[in-house]
Design a protein with these regions (language model features):
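A beta-strand edge to alpha-helix "cap/lid" segment located at domain peripheries
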Residues: 2-12, 58-143
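A solvent-exposed, acidic/Ser-Thr-rich amphipathic alpha-helical stretch
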Residues: 10, 14, 22, 29-81
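A generic signature of intrinsically disordered, low-complexity regions enriched in glycine/proline
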Residues: 22-25, 34, 50-53, 114, ...
Length: 143
């Protein structure tokens, strides 16, 4: 086991991450929202406004899952006292305007703050803008 993996498993936030990630892997807005605080902030830094509150987050996630078919390629996880940083790659199944399917890869970075109750209080998501722009343009999606 690598040193990074040993550190990840030693963090008290590792089990919180694991439960949280299951929500995303299974595309379950209710599970994801249940692990956030009532006053949570979820912010995809792509020019859009932050999503504020657990109920708004649940709706936002449901919309994401309805609009996009994506999976995860896991990268590094770094833990602090009240946060984790997660590098991952989004694997998007998209189609060109003529219907031809293609797969796009977009590098992502999550910065997640956890409150004293073990709830996700804030999640900031950063994406590789160039990769995302190229994928969406190829699919004819205007963002």
């Amino acid at each position: 086991m690598s040193v990074a993996a040993q550190v990840a498993h030693a963090s008290p936030l590792a089990p919180v991450f694991e439960r949280y990630h299951v929500g995303w892997e299974t595309r379950n807005p209710d599970l994801i929202a249940s692990l956030h605080s009532e006053d949570t902030i979820f912010w995809l830094h792509d020019g859009s406004d932050p999503v504020k509150g657990r109920d708004a987050l649940r709706r936002h996630c449901a919309g994401l899952f309805a609009a996009f078919n994506f999976s995860f390629e896991m990268g590094r996880r770094l833990y602090g006292e009240d946060h984790w940083i997660f590098e991952w790659t989004m694997i998007l199944s998209l189609a060109e305007p003529d219907g031809s399917p293609f797969t796009a890869r977009v590098e992502m970075l999550d910065v997640v703050t956890v409150n004293r109750r073990g709830e996700v209080a804030r999640k900031d998501v950063y994406m590789n803008g160039k990769q995302a722009e190229e994928a969406f343009a190829r699919a004819g999606i205007k963002r």
